[in-house]
Amino acid sequence: MKAELIAVGTEILTGQIVNTNAQFLSEKMAELGIDVYFQTAVGDNEERLLSVIDIASQRSDLVILCGGLGPTDDDLTKQTLAKYLGKALVFDEQAGQKLDAFFAHRKQAARTPNNQRQAQLIEGSIALQNQTGLAVGGLITVDRVTYVVLPGPPSELKPMVKNELVPLLSASHASLYSRVLRFFGIGESQLVTALEDLIKHQTDPTIAPYAKTGEVTLRLSTKADNQALADERLNRLEAQLLSIRTVDNQPLRRLLYGYGEDNSLARETFELLKRSGKTITAAESLTAGLFQAQLTDFAGASQVFNGGFITYSIEEKARMLGIPLGELQRHGVVSSFTAEQMAAQARCLTNSDIGIGLTGVAGPEALEGQPAGTVFIGLATKNKVESLKVVIGGRSRLDVRYIAALYAFNMVRKTLLKSENLL
């Protein structure tokens, strides 16, 4: 099945907004086994939109239009598609009731006749209800081409696609099953080199690498009749690729940290801390609280985290953590000594099981003779204090700080796994 995406809105063409909907929709279509062959952006102009719809209908089986469902005169997507299909617009009662409820609770908002446009639907369409907005979407098939209209705001489009559109399309198309593997400690080029033969000769299942900031993911995908058959194929491919070694002779299995599109090193570490009943603290310099902020993104963070420290200057490291100022000056702020002392003192002061210390040079200038990107991470438990030095070269200040936090999470993750004899 060939799909085409049409983004409607002059603001896209003028660069005022980025069309993130195209990426989201392409991913969702791929999960359904639907191939997106074309993506188009067109302004709020009926003549040009009619032309784009006509071209799409001649070469695609599924045409998805995003945007232009609002109440103003330049919101003309449904009106233009209805004109192209020779269909009338009808009023959707459920969407109309939502309009009534919205304005009933907002006396200060004046309802105008134009608002009725948001509850209109092309005659013969299946309504796609809007859980987070007012404009109803729709799906209609005419002459073997299926047309879908969706709202433009991602906060409205995404729930509509997940909860309304995907179930409809899933019922009529073969499914694509995917599994996302997440790796840390290896770059995309190194990973692709290690998997060169597998990628070169892939058919089904397929392997798709994606570079993220500081990490790499692999999406394994297969088209199958059911989940059990898909799992069998994906398990076989996963076992094969995880047994492969990198150019420096590391098994890829050791670099895999988790699964899932929305997973992260922070989440994996948080779950391990919860499972083991351990608590953690951190004293941060160059990351300025980033490690602690990511850790507390998850509900239940208070079970594993009581508090921590941001000690940016050398004086605050001495004052807040009780590290002798003379020792800090002698060893330098950017050093294994300082990272280890930060971790150990933070652990003792908060009575935590694990302490992390982060210090380094975010850049762009060097510090204490250390180049930008030099990071020392200390880790303290009741039994040991250790540190790791990493050099995150060629990155922005923001990336250095973010990747430094990733290394810290990975250090904690590996420590917890070793304590459970799982690494």
Curated annotation (Swiss-Prot):
- InterPro entries the UniProt entry points to: CinA, CinA-like_C, CinA_C, CinA_KH, Competence-induced_CinA, MoaB/Mog-like_dom_sf, MoaB/Mog_dom
Matches recorded under Gene3D superfamilies: 3.30.70.2860, CinA-like, MoaB/Mog-like domain
Taken from the UniProt record, the cysteine pairs bridged by disulfide bonds within this chain are: none
Q: Looking at the Swiss-Prot or TrEMBL record, what is one Pfam family this protein matches?
A: CinA_KH
Among NCBIfam families, the record links this protein to: cinA_nterm (TIGR00200), molyb_syn (TIGR00177), PncC_domain (TIGR00199), PRK00549.1 (NF001813)
Q: Which family does it belong to?
A: Belongs to the CinA family.
Its recorded name reads: Putative competence-damage inducible protein
What is the species of this protein?
Streptococcus equi subsp. equi (strain 4047)
